[in-house]
Amino acid sequence: MEYLIGIQGPDYVLVASDRVAASNIVQMKDDHDKMFKMSEKILLLCVGEAGDTVQFAEYIQKNVQLYKMRNGYELSPTAAANFTRRNLADCLRSRTPYHVNLLLAGYDEHEGPALYYMDYLAALAKAPFAAHGYGAFLTLSILDRYYTPTISRERAVELLRKCLEELQKRFILNLPTFSVRVIDKDGIHNLENIAFPKRDS
């Protein structure tokens, strides 16, 4: 039902998520933010069971911030991804597993931009582009066709829009607006939301 997408460029990561909060077949909100700021240059995108997403993301968020307060420096995106994955794996083997799918995007001064894909079974993979949700089945082929490692920001936004337009055309559910953000050496920046007009009945 939900959709996340991430595209890594040479010096940035572009991410987007839908803004719908739904319960079963009922839409509860159309302005729900599924992105959680871990640190100045790390963003966690989270979809899944309604309670699990917020509880798990905020738990990781507070622990990453606690690490900075204790040590005086922030975790790198790689370290944050492995910390998140370990916590998800530990919970999976407990009585209270979290049913969440994640994208973690960040920028490190030494390693550059990074995008990590994580699913509810705690599988972790570094990827040049990634997507979660049913929409991933419709858009991963577009990303595979048009993505290049040296893609510019303008071309990445065009590619993102192409994916979202395909979603509007082929996906039966209504996902009208998407939050878009970019992470680079200067931090996390909000881009203009991408919105689509409601379909004619």
From Swiss-Prot:
It comes from Mus musculus. Detected in liver (at protein level). One of its GO terms (biological process) is proteasomal protein catabolic process. Belongs to the peptidase T1B family. The gene is Psmb2. It comes from the Eukaryota. The keyword Acetylation applies. This is Proteasome subunit beta type-2. It is found in: Cytoplasm; Nucleus.
